[in-house]
Amino acid sequence: MGKDKTLPLLDPREPPELTGTKSASKVWAKEFGEESKRLWELAGPAIFTAISQYSLGALTQTFSGRLGELELAAVSVENSVISGLAFGVMLGMGSALETLCGQAYGAGQIRMMGIYMQRSWVILFTTALFLLPVYIWAPPILSFFGEAPHISKAAGKFALWMIPQLFAYAANFPIQKFLQSQRKVLVMAWISGVVLVIHAVFSWLFILYFKWGLVGAAITLNTSWWLIVIGQLLYILITKSDGAWTGFSMLAFRDLYGFVKLSLASALMLCLEFWYLMVLVVVTGLLPNPLIPVDAISICMNIEGWTAMISIGFNAAISVRVSNELGAGNAALAKFSVIVVSITSTLIGIVCMIVVLATKDSFPYLFTSSEAVAAETTRIAVLLGFTVLLNSLQPVLSGVAVGAGWQALVAYVNIACYYIIGLPAGLVLGFTLDLGVQGIWGGMVAGICLQTLILIGIIYFTNWNKEAEQAESRVQRWGGTAQE
């Protein structure tokens, strides 16, 4: 297949086995350190990119909150429900490129990566057209799910103005996966960081100084996402991405069926995870006197969202490492990368959990001045800490699945663990046994725990040599060569 062993971060050596001898332990520790360095070179910029892009919506909500309660509610609902739906679907559909581009890069089929990205554009822009009705008819959709009429109307109006962001998602995620698979994560980090600064300035200028209100918020958020797209695209067009970009090609329209299947599996896998904790907030709203529990859960989800940025960075890093090494035929190194990143992310999760538990009496006051809300948040902080720990490892295991191309399998696991076991258990504990928000969250955490254990089992019993062979077959079946 013309594999290039000089590709960055690819290493043809076999990883050491931990035999128990002192010398073997030293070698294993040395290799662990080297692999950790490779992972952090990818994860560090990826974490910064995730935080920067997450902050775009958070900053818009912050500035909109200065306009009034209705404006804040409109932006919050649109961001979390309408754009949240689109973000999850688009990110999931684009994640197929993590498998294909990563394995093509490892296999030395660099020129096929640009073709894969164009195929993903075709699929994601088509998907965006199918998602348009959600934006156009947002008010009745939100009202159907119980949102107050005046908030539904305001959020629906804001959703119409945010349609350009939908198509920015369609352009952005394939580009990001294309660059990420080549470990060009520093480029993404620089562009996202610069755009975040511009976004903060423009938000103040258009929302507050010029008093354009929600129109200014929409203009700023749309512009920021398109600046990210344009910046990354200019980098690719100017540098040719080390030969991975050879120009637009009609090959992008070939073999779309298999590509669509993998994209749909990726979207289903990710959306089932992405929406699971969102369901927690919705179900909590069905409790008697839900105002305080919903506020407490929202504070906890805010904390969990920020800590999740670390896991997302490691998700990207391990997806690249596994797909690259499998594509290069280095099955043992792919397995070793999984071990290293699992240990690293779990240790970080333990630290984050300790911080949450140690500050459970004080961090709620960063978000509220209500004693009742703060007390409820403190009461459920133990569940937050455990969720933070689980979610330090679970996205990493999902990243392994994406790198290996197991999206369809993990989607079935997610359906079973989250929606057949976790959610019903939460409903029984919360409503039937009258345990309230603690019961709802406890049941859903049980689903996450079960899913994590199943993924660990799948990874442990995986035949990595067979996965490397399947990666080679996948690259040949969905690409061949870019010259044909």
From Swiss-Prot:
Q: Which residues cross the membrane?
A: 39-59, 81-101, 122-142, 155-175, 190-210, 218-238, 267-287, 294-314, 338-358, 380-400, 409-429, 439-459
Keyword tags: Membrane, Transmembrane, Transmembrane helix, Transport
> Where is it located?
Membrane
What domain of life is recorded for the organism? Eukaryota
Write down the species: Arabidopsis thaliana (Mouse-ear cress)
Query: Biological process GO terms, please?
Result: xenobiotic detoxification by transmembrane export across the plasma membrane
Query: Per UniProt, what is the name of the gene that codes for the protein in this document?
Result: DTX33
Biased composition, Basic and acidic residues: where in the chain?
1-16
The Gene Ontology terms for molecular function here are: antiporter activity; xenobiotic transmembrane transporter activity
Cellular component per GO, a single term? membrane
Query: Region (Disordered) spans which residues?
Result: 1-22
Which family would the database say this protein is a member of?
A: Belongs to the multi antimicrobial extrusion (MATE) (TC 2.A.66.1) family.
Q: How does it sit in the membrane?
A: Multi-pass membrane protein
Name of this chain's protein: Protein DETOXIFICATION 33
